[in-house]
A protein has these predicted regions:
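An N-terminal hydrophobic leader/cap segment in hydrolases
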Residues: 1-25
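Membrane-embedded segments
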Residues: 27-104, 108, 113
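Short alpha-helix in the alpha/beta-hydrolase fold that links the catalytic acid
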Residues: 63, 171, 180, 194-203
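Primarily recognizes the serine-hydrolase "nucleophile elbow" in alpha/beta-hydrolase
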Residues: 104-108, 112-158
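Short beta-strand/loop motif that positions the catalytic acidic residue
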Residues: 178-179, 184-190
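Acidic catalytic loop of the alpha/beta-hydrolase fold
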Residues: 189-193, 219-221
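Catalytic histidine neighborhood in serine/cysteine hydrolases
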Residues: 199-220
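Post-His helix in hydrolase/transferase enzymes
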Residues: 222-236
Length: 239
């Protein structure tokens, strides 16, 4: 119900960013696929991108092609069970996958103060979990939810989802534990995660915090000039 690794909404975009395919080892001995775009580790921050609950890395090419135009390095990791990776996706397993990506980039020579965690939809749950009580440069949350139980209630209002759903991703309980600057992005037209959830996450977040809220964006936000401009402003504020 929650994880859809085989969903394909790949639009056919060609990857214009120069990337290195890397293998990221987890503590339970899985090797996960990652794409790494290195521009300048000393001059620029490094984004670790945690994607949502559906599709492959190719589904994010349109975003990566825009990120490459910013003064930033980035690593996007594919979850276990996604993009040909072995393993079963669960809440705790994806937390381990995310931490493995952080370990990989730190072993590559990037310190916490130069790492920006970027969560997309489900990935906001991993970014929020990992950012707690740490000193990362920043956190970006695109279409965040308050908890997976809250999000599921929209689609299953007559089912006791709190009892049935094992993976709860309780972002709202963790957001206060994040000390890093936060950018929350959400569109009012989101048909999957209600816009009010993004507003609530922003309200509960500590300062410094920034928002990019739009009228017309659905769940997967348009990576247009306005959004890229907001990302650029946020990244520059971290220097």
């Amino acid at each position: 119900m929650l994880y859809h690794p085989n969903e394909n909404n790949y639009s056919g975009n060609n990857l214009s960013a120069e990337i290195q395919k890397v293998k990221i080892k987890t503590s339970d001995n899985l090797e996960l696929l990652g794409w790494f775009h290195e521009k300048d580790l000393e001059k620029f921050k490094t984004i670790i991108f945690f994607h949502g609950n559906a599709g492959t890395l190719e589904n994010r090419i349109y975003k990566l092609n825009r990120l490459k135009d910013l003064d930033v390095n980035f690593l996007i990791i594919a979850w276990r069970g996604f993009s040909g990776n072995q393993g079963k996706p669960t809440e705790n397993n994806l937390y381990e996958d995310g931490r493995s990506a952080v370990r990989w980039i730190k072993n590559y020579g990037v310190e916490d103060e130069n790492i920006v965690l970027y969560g997309e939809s489900l990935g906001t749950g991993i970014a929020t979990e990992i950012a707690q009580n740490n000193n990362f440069a920043g956190v970006i949350l695109e279409t965040p939810f308050t908890s997976m139980v809250d999000a599921a209630k929209k689609f299953y209002p007559y089912i006791p989802v709190k009892l049935l759903l094992r993976d709860k991703y309780e972002n709202i309980k963790k957001i206060k534990n994040i000390r890093s600057p936060i950018l929350v992005m959400h569109g009012e037209a989101d048909q999957i995660v209600p816009f009010a959830m993004g507003q609530k996450i922003f309200q509960e977040a500590n300062n410094p915090k920034f928002s990019y809220f739009t009228k017309n964006d659905d769940h997967m936000m348009e990576f247009d000039e306005k959004l890229i401009g907001q990302l650029n402003l946020f990244l520059k504020s971290l220097n």
